[in-house]
């Protein structure tokens, strides 16, 4: 078994299937949630897992369909991913008691974390959103609750004999994975350890199922502005200035909200890989009880 992180691998049986996550450290719990793409896993939060576990008990989840969690053939939706976070929080509270939890998510998974925090506000003390989706341009995403941008016709096409797996295999060739990571970093200086794990994880049985839902937009929420509006917790949003993910004009909506704060790094979309000490220090300051 190839582990993404240097921590204790734990597994729980949940309503969303078999969930795997890594645990390390002591103290108040902190949850880390990786991105969503064709090759995602908990390996994408490695610098934070290593540094923050010196101060907290850190839980880094493999979301359903990714990493070592269950990869069954099904439709993967925001509801499924959000419920997986609820299941993890329920487990954490059984271990640590019913104290509030700090949580950080990256990219599209910020939408799942925000939804979980909006649905169970008393479970979360702080929410950290790294390069979150739903802020491109000034368009408001205020569809009816639970609606997604999913293209059902495309998902059905991708699930057809041979099509989806063939496309997935093309998108996860080592050269293609490196290409997309360079676009994420906005630089050729990607993290090689993360790259190697991305190549490995896409070769595992069932690795295509969740990414095919991602490719057909099933995991993008059309109501996410309404969800972000509901957040009562302290929210820290951060992003970089390089690569494909630099348009966050939508954050203007929360510029004067007392519970929101913002940091822009001279980095790609994963600033904690490039400025790990600075990012970790600022995260620790943010999540420290006042």
Where are these regions (language model features)?
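Conserved HGGG/HGGXW glycine-rich cap/lid loop of the alpha/beta-hydrolase fold
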Residues: 20-68
């Amino acid at each position: 078994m190839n582990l993404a992180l240097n921590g204790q691998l734990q597994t729980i049986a949940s309503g969303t299937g078999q969930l795997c996550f890594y645990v390390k450290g002591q103290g108040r719990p902190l949850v880390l949630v990786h991105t969503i793409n064709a090759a995602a896993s908990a390996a994408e939060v490695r610098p934070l897992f290593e540094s923050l576990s010196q101060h907290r008990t850190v839980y880094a989840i493999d979301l359903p369909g990714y990493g070592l969690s269950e990869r069954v053939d099904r439709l993967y939706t925001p509801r499924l991913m959000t419920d997986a976070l609820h299941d993890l929080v329920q487990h954490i509270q059984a271990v640590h008691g019913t104290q509030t939890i700090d949580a950080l998510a990256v990219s599209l998974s910020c939408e799942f974390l925000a939804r979980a925090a909006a649905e169970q506000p008393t479970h979360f003390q702080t929410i950290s959103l790294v390069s979150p989706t739903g802020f491109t341009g000034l368009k408001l995403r205020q569809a009816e609750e639970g609606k997604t941008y999913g293209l059902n016709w495309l998902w059905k096409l991708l699930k057809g004999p041979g099509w989806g797996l063939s496309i997935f295999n093309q998108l996860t060739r080592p050269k293609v994975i490196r290409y997309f990571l360079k676009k994420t970093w906005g630089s050729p200086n990607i993290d090689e350890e993360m790259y190697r794990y991305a190549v490995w994880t896409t070769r595992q049985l069932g690795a295509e199922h969740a990414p095919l839902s991602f490719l057909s937009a099933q995991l993008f929420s059309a109501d996410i502005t309404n969800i972000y509006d509901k957040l009562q917790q302290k929210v820290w949003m951060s992003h970089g200035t390089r690569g494909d993910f630099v348009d966050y004009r939508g954050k203007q909506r929360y510029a004067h909200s007392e519970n929101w704060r913002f940091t822009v790094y001279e980095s790609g979309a994963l600033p904690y890989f490039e400025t790990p000490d600075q990012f970790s220090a600022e995260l620790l300051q943010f999540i420290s009880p006042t």
